[in-house]
Every structure is written in C-alpha cells, then in structure tokens.
C-alpha cells in the first residue's frame, strides 16, 4: 500500500443484530483543522484532472441527434418521485384532474369526429360519386385556411429552420396515408377499410415508436391496446370471410387491403415524426403542412389517375364542407393529444370511431350491426374506458406527468 493511501484513516463500524453481525468499513478524510488535512485552492473550483479517461466518460454522456429526435446514448434508469415529491404532487390534484379530463374529452371528441367522417365519406361516395383524389384536393384547399391561425400565432408557416425537412416528410407521409386509405375505400367496403386502417395504425405506431425513438409503454397500456385491437379484429375478420368473390375480385380486394395496411403504416410514421418535433412545431403548422402538401398532390394526380367531376348541387358541397370540418376537428384533437400520450394510445382511443360509425349507420342508414360487430364494439368500448379510468385514477395522477417525461427519450 502506498504512502498516499496510508495517510487517510480507515474507520470500522460494527452493527450487532440478534442474528447477524454487520461490519462496515468507511474511509475517513481529514477535515479542516484535523491532522493530515491539506489546504487546496478551493476558489478555482477545478478538482478533476483532464485525462483521456475523463474525456471519454464525458463524451459518453453527450446526446446523440437522430432524424426522429434527440436520444440519450446512455439511457438512465427512470427514478420514481420520492415520497416527499409525491406529497407535493398530491397537494395539487385538481389541476391534474382538470388537465387530464380535458385531454380525454378532446380524444373522445376526435373519435366522434372520425366516426362522422366515415359516415359522410360513405354518403358522398354512394350519392355524389366524388373520386377519392378529388375529395382530398377539395378538403386540402379548405384546410389551407389554417395558415391564418399560423400567422396569428406568429409562427413560420413552413416551420423553423432545422425542422423543415422533417416537417415536409411528415406532410408527405400524411398525404400518402390519406391517398391509400381513400383509394382502398373504392375497392373494398369502406367499413372494412376504415377498421383495418385503424388497427394497423395502432400496431405500427407501437412498433415504430419503440424501434425509432425507443419509446415503450406500460404493461397496463399494452394490455388495453391488445384488447382494443382484438375487438377491431372481431369486427373486421367476419366481414371479410363472408364476402363471396371470384378469383379476380379476390386479387383486387387483396390490393385494396394492402393499401389500407400502407395507410396505417404511413399514418403511424407521420405520428412518430410529429411527436419528435412537437416542441417546435404547433398543431396548426402541422395542419397547414398537411393541407398544402395535399393540395399539391391532389392537383397533380387527380387528373392523371382518376376522372374528377365538378360538384354542382348543394348536397354534395354540404357533404364536402362537413368532411372538412369533421376531419379538421379530428386532426387537431389527435395531434393535441400526441403532445401528451404515446401514439399507440392515441390511436387506440380512436378505435371508438368504429363504435360511433355503427351507431350513426344504424340511425341514418338503418344498417343493423351483426353479432360480431356488437361483440367487437363492446370489447373496444371496454378497453378504451378501462384505459381512460386507469389514466384518470387518483393514484396515477401524481406520477403520470413525471413518469411520461422520464420514460420518453424525445427531448
């Protein structure tokens, strides 16, 4: 043992228990006024030597920037609040309750709006025969007016510098998803296409969030997501099996369902991209990006791929305006919730669209849901209500905000 280590005394503490004897050794460093204390220059505040090992450790703590956000290269274990901190959270439960309730009201409202869009899309397809790309074009032109909100909040319409590429990529993903979804509705029954679109969006958002940004979910959230997807499958699969088609129609419908899967994949990807830039891009800027990219895409493709028509009657224009209003409300609700919740959870709540669409079809179109539709809708409803009750429970309100911030790797 060298002389430098011998000058510090080693103290031994013995703790005697009825069954065991614990010995603990601790190093004692001389304090000011004691023998062996060396007076260092405390004013400088520099006590760490600059060595290659130190530089390597410091470099390991730096943050790595990726296309989808900023991710820690060394993930620190999530630490729960201390009991004193939990007491601090419990001192202000009313604000947490109001904020959480507001968030869930917005989510449920967006699900209702999505259900209205599904019904109106079917009505305009059956009665007005408006092609899907023209529908996207007209909807996007009306949503371009969201630039007024962007200018009102003094935000750059095309996003701040450093985020424009990701914002443009987000808009392209959204336009591709809507195009694939609306195109599939002309090949497969719109109800089946909408259901598969929602189910694949939920599954892909959970997978992509984990793979791209390392954002996981709690075990209770996973159970509710799986239960809701199971309910969606109960509604969708029997409807597909009952269809009797020829070989050519089978291949055509296979292409249609492939388009819905692509719509779900690109929708999930757009949600992940927005979640990585949500701190710098507002939902109004995101809506404007979606609208102008949709306008450019619809104007350049609807004359090449489809035969557009000119809506002349007031009924068609009322459907178009209703679709625009409902889709805008649903869009803002979903992307407002994305700033708080995991994308898979947001998509799971939107499964209520299927239940809302069933009720609206029964009231407006007099279409009775089948047995599997009722069972699947009940499973979806129970899963979403259980998820909402779990998130709004008193014991989780204190740590919900803290835990989501700690678990998220997007800063």
UniProtKB/Swiss-Prot annotation:
Keyword vocabulary terms for this entry: Cell membrane, Cytoplasmic vesicle, Membrane, Repeat, Synapse, Transmembrane, Transmembrane helix
Disulfide bonds, paired cysteine numbers: none
Gene Ontology CC, one term: plasma membrane
SUPFAM superfamilies: Multidrug resistance efflux transporter EmrE
Membrane topology: Multi-pass membrane protein
Residue spans crossing the bilayer: 104-124, 130-150, 168-188, 193-213, 217-237, 254-274, 285-305, 318-338, 345-365, 367-387
Repeat recorded as keyword: yes
UniProt domain EamA: residue ranges: 112-237, 261-389
Protein family according to the UniProt entry: Belongs to the SLC35G solute transporter family.
Name this polypeptide is given: Solute carrier family 35 member G2
Organism: Gallus gallus (Chicken)
Name of the gene: SLC35G2
